[in-house]
Regions:
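Buried hydrophobic positions in well-ordered alpha/beta secondary-structure cores of metabolic enzymes
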Residues: 11-14, 67, 138, 179, ...
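Generic secondary-structure signature for well-ordered alpha-helical cores
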Residues: 26, 30-34, 65-68, 101-108, ...
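N-terminal beta-loop-helix "entrance" segment that forms/cooperates
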Residues: 33-57, 231-233
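Short coil/turn connectors at secondary-structure junctions
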Residues: 1-4, 34, 64-66, 104-106, ...
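Glycine-rich phosphate/pyrophosphate-binding loop and the adjoining helix
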Residues: 141-143, 147-186, 190-191, 196-198, ...
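Glycine-rich phosphate/nucleotide-binding loop
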Residues: 45-48, 90, 233-334
Length: 360
C-alpha cells in the first residue's frame, strides 16, 4: 500500500514527538511492505514566524491532496509569546480551526485508554480501574453552540449576551453513523449523551440517533443525560465503549475522560470526514516549557499514527502491532517523566520511541 501523509510538526514539542511517530511508521512500512510518502507543511506559530499567517493557502492545498494529516502540536505560551499579541484570526490556533473547516473534518475521536501499568497516575480508587478501561469519545466537531450566531448588546441599560445552538438531521445522522461503524469494530455499544430533558437540539439528537441505531442491530444503544455521564465517568468508567455526543458536551467530557486515565501524554485523537481522510494528533498541547529537552512523552502521537493506520488506511493489524508494543514497553517498566513512578526506569523522548520499535 502507498499513501501520502501530510506532516505538520508544529510548535513546542511538536517536532520531537512527530519524529518518533514517523520512526514507528517507517518500521511498519518496512515490515509490511507499505510505502508512506511524507510532505511537510508549516502551521501555527512556525508558519507565523515564516510567513506571517498561521496557515498559508499553499500549505492548505498540499494537505487537501494527501491521504491524511499527522500533526504534532500548535501554539505557545499565551502569556509570553508574541504570537498572542496578534489579532485572534492570526494566532496559531486559527490555523487549526481553518484546516479543520477546509478539510471538512466533522467527527472527533478521542480514545481514553487506561493501562493497568499506570494505575499510580490515576486519581480514581483502585477498585474502579483494576483491569483497565478503553472507551472512545466521538464528538461532533462543526456544529452546535460553538458555531452558532452570537451577539452581545445593550438592553434596558445592561449588556445581554446571546448564543444560538442548532443541529440538523444531516449533521446528527452522519456523526451517529460514524459512531456505530466504530462500535462495530469494538465492543458494540454506543452511549449517546444529550440533555433531552431540557434542550430541543438534544431531543432531535436522541430521535435521529435512535433511527440510525435500527441499521445496526448488533450494537447496543443507550441514551444518557450529560450530567449523569459526567458522574458515571468517574464512578464506573469501565461501563463505556463508544460515547457519542455533540460539540460542547464532547469538549467537556473528553477532557474529563483524559484526566481519569492519569496522563494526557498518553491520549491520541483523530478528526475525520465522511470518507477515509483524517487528521491525527495528540490530545495534549505544545508544552513550550519542555521543548527541545528530549523529555516529552511521544506515546500519544505514536498512538495517533496507529489510529491513522486503522481509520484512514484500514490497516488494523499494523495498528495493533504498535499498540501492543506500547503496552509491552510499559510492562517492562519504562516511563517518560510525566508518567514516572517509584521503581520505574526514566527514559527520554527518543529512547521511548526506540523501545517501542524494539518491541514491534
Amino acid at each position: 500500500m502507498e499513501k501520502n501523509i501530510t506532516v505538520i510538526k508544529g510548535d513546542g514539542i511538536g517536532p520531537e514527538i512527530v519524529n518518533e511517530a514517523i520512526k514507528i511508521l517507517d518500521v511498519i512500512a518496512d515490515k509490511y511492505n507499505h510505502k508512506f510518502n511524507y510532505t511537510q507543511i508549516l502551521m501555527g506559530g512556525a508558519s507565523i514566524d515564516e510567513y506571517g499567517v498561521p496557515l498559508t493557502d499553499e500549505a492548505l492545498e498540499i494537505a487537501k491532496k494527501g491521504d491524511s494529516v499527522l500533526l504534532g502540536a500548535i501554539g505557545g505560551d499565551t502569556t509570553t509569546s508574541p504570537w498572542y499579541k496578534l489579532e485572534p484570526n492570526l494566532r496559531p490556533e486559527a490555523g487549526l480551526l481553518k484546516i479543520r473547516k477546509e478539510l471538512g473534518l466533522f467527527a472527533n475521536l478521542r480514545p481514553a485508554v487506561f493501562y493497568d501499568e499506570l494505575k499510580e497516575a490515576c486519581p480514581l480508587k483502585e477498585e474502579l480501574i483494576t483491569g483497565g478501561f478503553d472507551m472512545m469519545i466521538m464528538r461532533e466537531l462543526t456544529g452546535g453552540l460553538y458555531f452558532g450566531k452570537r451577539t452581545t448588546k445593550k438592553e434596558n441599560g445592561q449588556l445581554v449576551a446571546y448564543d444560538s445552538m442548532s443541529y440538523s438531521e444531516t449533521e446528527i445522522r452522519r456523526i451517529a453513523k460514524r459512531a456505530f461503524d466504530i462500535a462495530m469494530k469494538r465492543n458494540k455499544k454506543v452511549t449517546s449523551v444529550d440533555k433531552a430533558n431540557v434542550i430541543d437540539t438534544s431531543r432531535l439528537w436522541r430521535k435521529v440517533v435512535s433511527e440510525v441505531a435500527k441499521d445496526y442491530p448488533e450494537v447496543t444503544l443507550e441514551h444518557m443525560l450529560v450530567d449523569n455521564c459526567a458522574m458515571q465517568l468517574v464512578k464506573d468508567p469501565k461501563q463505556f465503549d463508544v460515547i457519542l455526543t455533540e460539540n460542547m458536551f464532547g469538549d467537556i467530557l473528553s477532557d474529563e475522560a483524559s484526566m481519569v486515565t492519569g496522563s494526557i501524554g498518553m491520549l491520541s485523537s483523530a478528526s475525520l470526514r465522511e470518507d477515509k481522510f483524517g487528521m491525527y494528533e495528540p490530545s495534549h498541547g505544545s508544552a513550550p516549557d519542555i521543548a527541545g529537552k528530549n523529555i516529552a512523552n511521544p506515546i500519544a502521537t505514536i498512538l495517533s499514527a496507529a489510529m491513522m493506520l486503522r481509520y484512514s488506511f484500514d490497516l488494523d493489524r499494523e495498528a495493533n502491532v504498535i499498540e501492543e508494543a506500547i503496552e509491552k514497553v510499559l510492562k517492562q517498566g519504562y516511563r517518560t517523566s510525566d508518567i514516572m513512578s517509584d521503581g520505574k526506569t526514566l527514559v527520554g523522548t527518543k529512547e521511548m520511541g526506540d523501545l517501542i520499535v524494539a518491541n514491534m
